[in-house]
C-alpha cells in the first residue's frame, strides 16, 4: 500500500534527501503536503515535481508568492501559511506518514499533532523530544502513533536494538558516535576566533547552517543524548558519546553478554531516511555500498569537554530534568543565530547557554504551555545576555 507523506521542512537538507528517496520509489510513496518557512522558490519547484495537495509556508507574503507561481504553472496545490496550517497538515486524514524535519522549536507543535493523530512519524526534529520528551512520548503511546527515528545515530541504534523495550533486551548501554566536527583537533584557546563559515564546514556530512554549528560545538550530540533517553527509555548514565572521525559507524549498542552491535554505512542521510520510510522493509536509497577496504582505518576517542562545553551543558540539563532541556535548546537557538549573524563569537554560544541555565529557575512543567513558556523565557534571557556581550573580534583574513 502506497504511503502518503506530509514532509515538514521540505526545503532543508533532510527534505531534499527525503524527496530524493521518494522519487526513486513512486510506487511506494506519494506526497500529500510539503512545507517550508520562506524558501518559496524552492518549494514551488518541489510542488511542480511532486504535486502535493497542500503546500504550507511561514507567512502570508511568501504564500502569495508561491500561490502565484503555482497558479501560473497550472498547479492545483492549495497554499496555506502559518503555524496552525503546519498542525493541520500533520494531523490530516490525507496523510498516514509525517516526516518531521523542521529545524528548531517551530517543529514541536506539528510533530506533537502528528503523534496525537496516531501517525507514523519519521522524526528528524530534535526539539519535540528535547523540549517536551515526556509529553511527546506519552502522546505516541496514548494515540498509537509509530515513532521511527531519522537522525543517523538514533536510526542506527534502532536497527541494532531488539524490538522489545531496552530493559528487557539485555542492553548494557548505547553509544552515540560523533565526528567531532571541524574543530576536533583545534586547541580550545584558538576557537575564540572561529568564523561562521569555518563552523559550517563539516568534514563528513552535508547539513544546514544551524545544525552544522551545533555539530561544531557538539551541542548536536548533547541534544541527541537527550533524544536517545526518551526514544529508548535509557537513563543518561547508560548513554555514552564516542568521537569517531570517519563517520562510518553511526552508533552502537552494548549488551550485557559483552556483545556490541554497530550499524555502519557511508555518511549519507538517505540511508536512515529510506530505512524509516520503508520500515520494516528495505529499499534502494541511492547510496553507494560501503567499502571498508578503501576506508582501511576506523578510529575512536573520548570527547574533550574543555573543547566542547556545550556537550557537557546538555548532559547536565538531562540530569537536572524539568525545563532545563527546553531552556538549553532555546538559549542555544538564540545564541547560534547570533553567532551566524556575527553578533557574538563562537565560544560565546556555550557561555550564553550556561548563563541562561544558571539564571532560569528549574521546575517541572505542568504541560505543553509550561514548556513553551520556559522556551520563551529562556529566549528572552539569552537575547539580553547577548545584547550585553562584547562584540566578536574582527574576522581575520586568511
From Swiss-Prot:
- Which SUPFAM superfamilies does this UniProt record tie to the protein? 1-deoxy-D-xylulose-5-phosphate reductoisomerase, C-terminal domain (SSF69055), Glyceraldehyde-3-phosphate dehydrogenase-like, C-terminal domain (SSF55347), NAD(P)-binding Rossmann-fold domains (SSF51735)
Q: Where does 1-deoxy-D-xylulose 5-phosphate bind?
A: 126, 152-153, 179, 202, 215, 220-221, 224
Which cofactors are required for activity? Mg(2+); Mn(2+)
Question: Domain of life of the organism in this record?
Answer: Bacteria
Matches recorded under Pfam families: DXP_redisom_C (PF08436), DXP_reductoisom (PF02670), DXPR_C (PF13288)
- Tell me, which GO biological process terms does this entry list? isopentenyl diphosphate biosynthetic process, methylerythritol 4-phosphate pathway involved in terpenoid biosynthetic process
Q: Which residues bind NADPH?
A: 11-14, 38-39, 125, 127, 208
Q: Which UniProt keywords apply?
A: Isoprene biosynthesis, Manganese, Metal-binding, NADP, Oxidoreductase
The record lists the catalysed reaction(s) as: 2-C-methyl-D-erythritol 4-phosphate + NADP(+) = 1-deoxy-D-xylulose 5-phosphate + NADPH + H(+)
Which PANTHER family does the record match to this protein? 1-DEOXY-D-XYLULOSE 5-PHOSPHATE REDUCTOISOMERASE (PTHR30525), 1-DEOXY-D-XYLULOSE 5-PHOSPHATE REDUCTOISOMERASE, CHLOROPLASTIC (PTHR30525:SF0)
Provide the family line. Belongs to the DXR family.
Name listed for the protein in its UniProt record:
1-deoxy-D-xylulose 5-phosphate reductoisomerase
Which gene name belongs to this protein? dxr
Amino acid at each position: 500500500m502506497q504511503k502518503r507523506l506530509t514532509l515538514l521542512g521540505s526545503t532543508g537538507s533532510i527534505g531534499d534527501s527525503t524527496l530524493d528517496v521518494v522519487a526513486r520509489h513512486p510506487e511506494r510513496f506519494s506526497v500529500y503536503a510539503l512545507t517550508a518557512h520562506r524558501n518559496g522558490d524552492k518549494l514551488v519547484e518541489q510542488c511542480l515535481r511532486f504535486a502535493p495537495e497542500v503546500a504550507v509556508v511561514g507567512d502570508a507574503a511568501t504564500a502569495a508568492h508561491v500561490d502565484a507561481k503555482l497558479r501560473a504553472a497550472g498547479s492545483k496545490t492549495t497554499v496555506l501559511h502559518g503555524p496552525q496550517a503546519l498542525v493541520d497538515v500533520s494531523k490530516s486524514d490525507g496523510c498516514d506518514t509525517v516526516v518531521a524535519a523542521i529545524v528548531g522549536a517551530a517543529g514541536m507543535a506539528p510533530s506533537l499533532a502528528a503523534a496525537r493523530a496516531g501517525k507514523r512519524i519519521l522524526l528528524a526534529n530534535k526539539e519535540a523530544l528535547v523540549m517536551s520528551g515526556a509529553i511527546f512520548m506519552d502522546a505516541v503511546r496514548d494515540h498509537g502513533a509509530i515513532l521511527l527515528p531519522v537522525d543517523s545515530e538514533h536510526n542506527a541504534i534502532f536497527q541494532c536494538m531488539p524490538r522489545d523495550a531496552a530493559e528487557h533486551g539485555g542492553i548494557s548501554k548505547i553509544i552515540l558516535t560523533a565526528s567531532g566536527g571541524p574543530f576536533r583537533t583545534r586547541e580550545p584557546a584558538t576557537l575564540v576566533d572561529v568564523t561562521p563559515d569555518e563552523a559550517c564546514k563539516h568534514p563528513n556530512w552535508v547539513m544546514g547552517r544551524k545544525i552544522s554549528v551545533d555539530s561544531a560545538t557538539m551541542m548536536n550530540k548533547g541534544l541527541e543524548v537527550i533524544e536517545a533517553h526518551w526514544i529508548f527509555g535509557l537513563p543518561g548514565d547508560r548513554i555514552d558519546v564516542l568521537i569517531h572521525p570517519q563517520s562510518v559507524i553511526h552508533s552502537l549498542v552494548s549488551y550485557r553478554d559483552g556483545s556490541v552491535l554497530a550499524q555502519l554505512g557511508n555518511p549519507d542521510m538517505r540511508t536512515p531516511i529510506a530505512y524509516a520510510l520503508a520500515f520494516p522493509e528495505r529499499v534502494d536509497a541511492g547510496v553507494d555500498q560501503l567499502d571498508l577496504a578503501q576506508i582501511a582505518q576506523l578510529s575512536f576517542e573520548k570527547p574533550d569537554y574543555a573543547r566542547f562545553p556545550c556537550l557537557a551543558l546538555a548532559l547536565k540539563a538531562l540530569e537536572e530534568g524539568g525545563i532545563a532541556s527546553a531552556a538549553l535548546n532555546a538559549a542555544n537557538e538564540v545564541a547560534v543565530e547570533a553567532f551566524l549573524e556575527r553578533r557574538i563569537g563562537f565560544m560565546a554560544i556555550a557561555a550564553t547557554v550556561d548563563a541562561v541555565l544558571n539564571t532560569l529557575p528549574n521546575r517541572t512543567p505542568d504541560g505543553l504551555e509550561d514548556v513553551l513558556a520556559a522556551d520563551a523565557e529562556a529566549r528572552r534571557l539569552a537575547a539580553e545576555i547577548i545584547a550585553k556581550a562584547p562584540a566578536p573580534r574582527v574576522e581575520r583574513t586568511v
